[in-house]
Amino acid sequence: MSKFWSPFVSDLVPYVPGEQPKLTRLVKLNTNENPYGPSPKAIDAMRTALTDDLRLYPDPNSDLLKHAVADYYKVQPSQVFLGNGSDEVLAHIFHALFQHDAPLLFPDISYSFYPVYCGLYGIDYETVPLDEQFQIRAEDYARPNAGIIFPNPNAPTGCLLGLDKVEQIIKASPDSVVVVDEAYIDFGGETAITLVDRYPNLLVTQTLSKSRSLAGLRVGLAVGHPDLIEALERVKNSFNSYPLDRMANVGGAAAFEDREHFETTRNKVIESREALVEQLQGKGFEVLPSAANFIFARHPRHDAAALAAKLREQGVIVRHFKQQRIAQFLRISIGTPEQHQALLEGLSDL
């Protein structure tokens, strides 16, 4: 703390990102990165873009990538917003659309950046408890609010809310913006982007960090009614008119165009997830149903924090949360079969 800090900054509780260890020999299963590389076509596109043109600013509208996203999801470019990772997209959403008199609603166990944004922008919020099975209950959101946001699949639980229930939430709050945060949707769910033409209050966010294997590039997007997109563009252009560099634009566009690589790697992650679930259940773990590229598991006889520490001693990093309802769970990112073998060897004496 410094005497130069404003009281506002002194009171901020920032987001704590997952550990990015410097030692490369560690088995890293803690931040939900894709174990398989990006599309070779995306890599080639970025190599081709390494020219003298890097002296020039990138396209502020990111039209190349915007059109690639629009073509992929069969929407109009005017319905697409792009940002420097979905976290920046979400920050602009909170700033542009959630500063109202009534509270914002989101699950009590959810993405931990949501309350950080509320603190940053002075947004009142209420958390809505998940049920005993850690599922979102659509009916619990049918109450006065100034906006709703939830991840689907949820993070860190991995549980999926069916599209019919998503639509139920949207219908119940026609005068509020409903944001469906779909960072993990490609690993087992149906996107709500198919609903945006029916509901002008719906905004869907996604990222290229997970299923497109481009976490190091930082590309996020939102799809919704042009009026909502315009609000985000106003905030963006009052903050940073060039959020995506040339590499992100061409690499992201190529990643969307390479459907074969996307489907192949996505399917490998899903197959590995189901195999790991079965293996952990064989060791006595309770594993929540996951539609993401991670699983959420607890063991009835072993403390989760102690298990995480034990695994780390053996070179395997997983994520442990201290939040009360989930303090006995571990979140384990889906890796390669070799990484899973290292994990299971670390748990061999259970």
Swiss-Prot record:
The modification N6-(pyridoxal phosphate)lysine is found at K210. Disulfide bonds: none annotated. Its EC number is 2.6.1.9. GO terms for molecular function: histidinol-phosphate transaminase activity; pyridoxal phosphate binding. PANTHER family: HISTIDINOL-PHOSPHATE AMINOTRANSFERASE, HISTIDINOL-PHOSPHATE AMINOTRANSFERASE-RELATED. NCBIfam families: hisC (TIGR01141). Homodimer. This is Histidinol-phosphate aminotransferase. It comes from Pseudomonas syringae pv. syringae (strain B728a). The gene is hisC.
